[in-house]
Amino acid sequence: MNYTNDIRDYLALEIEILKKLDVEQINAALNLLDETRQKKGRIYICGNGGSAATASHFQNDFNKGVSEYIDVPFRFHCLNDNVATLMAIANDIGYEEVFRFQLRNNLEENDVLVAISGSGNSHNVIRAVEYAKEHGCKIIGLTGFSGGKLKELSDISLHAPVNSMQ
């Protein structure tokens, strides 16, 4: 089987999407993350499904990959990495609280929340965002589709104008 045309079509689509990203918002996000690092603030990150895997990978890339080469390391904390904590909260309180409840125990004013939701409407992510905003934290939102509520609530919105989560 020859996938050459499929590969070309896929790459062309990816290039078009990348061209539509707002580089000013990406720059603002990087500056906020760096300012938070320099102030020794914490950066919380969360998402569901594939976005959870992305959140976990972000934590790894910044805490190990980037921090290995700088004096003041990043302090990323992925809210979906502790399965026992997630399951206890989901079982005893409700899945809509799995991220907000963890923030309640740890969040401080100079911290940042990076929230990832393809639709921008994941209820548990939105509850965490609202809680963090109420406590003076900045929000970086990563969204697709129309961006949903997360795009509206984010201080910095990294929105990919796509209608697929591939």
Where are these regions (language model features)?
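Generic N-terminal amphipathic, Lys/Arg-enriched alpha-helix
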Residues: M1-L21
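Glycine-rich phosphate-binding loops that contact phosphosugars or nucleotide phosphates
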Residues: S51-Q166
